[in-house]
């Protein structure tokens, strides 16, 4: 998923969705950490892994969001619960816990992708029904409006750089 998401981020950026590109990249980094967690359970030597992998295609941001959401859904609803069950049956409770905890993250990834997909479909990525705070991802300029400006009044970057302001401090 990590590599696929980095490709999807490039498409989103080209299509003028800087925030969506950033979400794809953030998720790609989280997927890297999931892989690292699972990799640490391997104890060296040769390991035979039999699995199928969704090759998919790189398409539009809309289609990429839909594909990403579907993939995350499969991970949290089927793949990881089944893997946790097998780990429990084979006497690896710590591995089972990791699968269950990471499945919770994958459910959040799906939720985020579906929310962004709905906004792309409704053409509401840069517009809301009520006033919100919009922040320029480039320079930090903030304004209250229903719609992000076509161009940042401070740094002149295009609308693509605006996202709803979030405060995580």
Regions found by a protein language model. Give the residues of each.
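Non-heme di-metal
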Residues: 1-169
